[in-house]
Amino acid sequence: MAVVRVVGAGYACLMSSRTIRILDLFAGAGGLTAGFHEASDRFRSVAAVELDPAAAASYSATFAKTDVFTGPIQDWLARADMPADVDVVVGGPPCQGFSALGKRDAADERNSLWRQYAEVLTHVRPGYFVVENVPAFGRSRQYQDFLTATRPGGFLEDYALEHRVLNAADYGAPQVRKRTVVIGHRRDLEAPGFPEATHAPEAAGGLLPYRTVGEALLGVPAVPDMDGRFDEVRTRVGDRELPGAFSPRELHFSRAYRPISRERFAAIPEGGSRADLPDELKAPCWRRHTTGSMDVMGRLRADRPSVTIRTEFFKPEKGRYLHPTEHRAITHYEAALLQGFPDSHRFIGSRTAIARQIGNAVPIPLGAAIARRLLEVL
């Protein structure tokens, strides 16, 4: 195995240059893999599994050397030709069944997808694995079942795991996004622990200040300038042609708004929301109900990280997604920047499908921080 001698401040150590092979489950458009690739060119995605054809196509377009399976993970498991010599398995099983967003459903079949993830571990036997999910996952029955499987007599007894809720803003993402991160390791290997925060609300103790919306969007044209591009490029996916593949920059297109919407946007100050609207611009339901989320039709602040970027960020009525200074929602490009996607990433699909890929992704800086932590033991 090749090694590289690294000389630091007063010390020298040996660091392996061996390729670290990644298997990405429930891969989406590849946000978590992108974070690993950003952390080190030692990481290489060798296989990925994704149900959604558009997201799988985006993954393939970005990581051209990866074997991407499009379909249910159960079908992939039935093929019995899993990749060999996998070092790290990563992935985020769909979380809607135990998400804090909306009603939780203990019977939701998506809650059992962690079992398919765990079954993959028994087949490929990686040294390490990472599961990313909503904050509620660590308090769920599903996580407890996962933990029980690692105890003596369990089908994952050769592994140990622990979890923490991490905030992407603490690792350099210009976005407040809290996620449960589970990191597991084979018991014969060193436990990696969790990445230390690199950023804080204010610079102190060696930590950098949070990255802001203004920093992330610096230099982005105020007026979206890619409206025509979306209809010009097509990629064949199965028996269909889908829009793409697009770089993030090519996703800076506009959305048509009604005159009343533009009036409302213009009346909302930076950091404000529908609560700041005069009565004549409020919808009847807003006048009747003064409680509820104040993020609805909210405007981002340029001097702070953004709120969590979700899948409908292009709809101001769905949250705090108005541009800090422009009278419009953030564009797909701006949302991708707030998620940390590099311009080398590629997206395929309808506008809605690409928004879903962006909003469902693990922020790249968070994935990179996890990857760098794993590098310390790999």
Please tell me what each predicted stretch does.
Residues 29, 143, 179, 210, ...:
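Short alpha-helical patches at coil-to-helix transitions and adjacent helical residues
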Residues 1-7:
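Extreme N-terminal basic, low-complexity initiation segments
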Residues 79-86, 98-288:
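Class I S-adenosyl-L-methionine
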Residues 16-125, 135-148:
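Core alpha/beta nucleotide-donor-binding catalytic domains of modification enzymes
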Residues 93-96, 187-188, 314:
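Short glycine-rich anion-binding loops that position phosphate/pyrophosphate groups of nucleotides
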Residues 43, 174-176, 211, 303, ...:
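A short, structural micro-pattern
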